[in-house]
UniProtKB/Swiss-Prot annotation:
Organism lineage string: Viruses, Riboviria, Pararnavirae, Artverviricota, Revtraviricetes
Protein origin, superkingdom: Viruses
Organism from which the protein derives: Bovine immunodeficiency virus (strain R29)
Protein name (Swiss-Prot/TrEMBL): Protein Vpw
């Protein structure tokens, strides 16, 4: 049961990531999300209106 439960959790995690970015391999998602956040942060330095959350 433990293995199956872990498998289900892993599958759920993968499925959530695929909703974020269905066209990327799972192993690239973390890196691409980091890059995207970094791009947003650097853009907001030059253009404050880019980041509407702050």
């Amino acid at each position: 049961m433990g293995v199956r439960e872990a498998d289900r959790i892993q599958h759920d995690r993968v499925r959530k990531k695929r909703e974020i970015s269905p066209y990327l391999p799972v192993r690239d998602l973390e890196k691409s999300l980091d890059d995207r956040n970094r791009i947003y942060r650097s853009k907001s330095v030059y253009d404050p209106s880019w980041n509407t959350h702050h």
